[in-house]
């Protein structure tokens, strides 16, 4: 049987029947080749009062939305951190040693994290705190790592672009300059390639006190060439102005070995710190994806339990299932489920065939209504 590749699952529950597996067997017979079904093993939880269940239904809906939002945020950031290793994201989205599909279809309640002796309200609060903690930690860790990345990116941006703007540190060396002179200074000039001959003919006349023969070509990139020229310090401003009038741009650059070395050292430090933080961050993202995904599926289990009790009443007796629609079979599957469970909505007014048959439900903002408890689960977090 071919299954859907969209990561979509339907979490449903229907009333239990006399035989332990009667409801389950009936579901499997009816859905046939339209889906792959797994039991959603939700344990006996503390029911509480009807008022508590109604309030909890709304709380769990909000918690569900919040958990999914944090998961998507974490996965998106995980993908960004992996950078050129983005293809490895899927293998890191695991819960312990299980992939998402296995965790969902072979779900087992984690009693150590979410003790069954606790009330539904307390369980939802435990999960809520867990989600908030992961969300807050993600903000802190992403801010710290992003600051490093941004500082490195800022440094790297200076090494690209045209000779008019880029950092010159890697293009020059001490031998290109007259250093430690009381009177002389070497400046760097950006010359349009089409004006190179003009520069070589005119540079010594752009102001007085330019050292003849001191112009030296350092490099050429794109539409510009980079030259040095040596002149007396007291005429530098005059030289800059005259050069600009001739479309020769004097870069604001003074060669200082210590400053250049410090810049290179700073980048090396940032790169080393980024590499130092990378592995622990990947590990944290992987572990906490597993934590929040597990919490998310437990929220779904709580929602199925609460809605089943509200809809089917006491004593608690329902069959929950994880249904994976086969590719292209969603419509047919929905029809089969409708035929199988339409009787659950039997009333004096007759069963609800479509949502339009119930203005009351539509007025409450219900967008999807089925005669059985239904929640959609989409585990494709890599696509929005």
UniProtKB/Swiss-Prot annotation:
It is a peripheral membrane protein. GO terms for molecular function: hydrolase activity; proton transmembrane transporter activity; proton-transporting ATPase activity, rotational mechanism. SUPFAM superfamilies: Vacuolar ATP synthase subunit C (SSF118203). One of its GO terms (cellular component) is intracellular organelle. Expressed ubiquitously; higher levels are found in gastrointestinal and hypodermal cells, as well as H-shaped excretory cell. Signal peptide: none annotated. Keywords: Cytoplasm, Developmental protein, Hydrogen ion transport, Ion transport, Membrane, Transport. It comes from the Eukaryota. Pfam families: V-ATPase_C. The keyword Membrane applies. Disruption phenotype: Worms display embryonic lethality. When vha-11 is silenced in adults, they are able to produce eggs but egg numbers gradually decrease and worms become sterile after 24 hours. This sterility continues for about 4 days and then viable eggs are produced again. It is found in: Cytoplasm; Membrane. Its main location: cytoplasm. GO terms for biological process: embryo development ending in birth or egg hatching; ovulation. Vha-11 and vha-3 are transcribed on a dicistronic transcript where vha-3 is the upstream transcript and vha-11 the downstream. Subunit of the V1 complex of vacuolar(H+)-ATPase (V-ATPase), a multisubunit enzyme composed of a peripheral complex (V1) that hydrolyzes ATP and a membrane integral complex (V0) that translocates protons. V-ATPase is responsible for acidifying and maintaining the pH of intracellular compartments and in some cell types, is targeted to the plasma membrane, where it is responsible for acidifying the extracellular environment. Subunit C is necessary for the assembly of the catalytic sector of the enzyme and is likely to have a specific function in its catalytic activity. Belongs to the V-ATPase C subunit family. V-ATPase is a heteromultimeric enzyme made up of two complexes: the ATP-hydrolytic V1 complex and the proton translocation V0 complex. The V1 complex consists of three catalytic AB heterodimers that form a heterohexamer, three peripheral stalks each consisting of EG heterodimers, one central rotor including subunits D and F, and the regulatory subunits C and H. The proton translocation complex V0 consists of the proton transport subunit a, a ring of proteolipid subunits c9c'', rotary subunit d, subunits e and f, and the accessory subunits vah-19/Ac45 and vah-20/PRR. This is V-type proton ATPase subunit C. It comes from Caenorhabditis elegans. The lineage of its organism: Eukaryota, Metazoa, Ecdysozoa, Nematoda, Chromadorea.
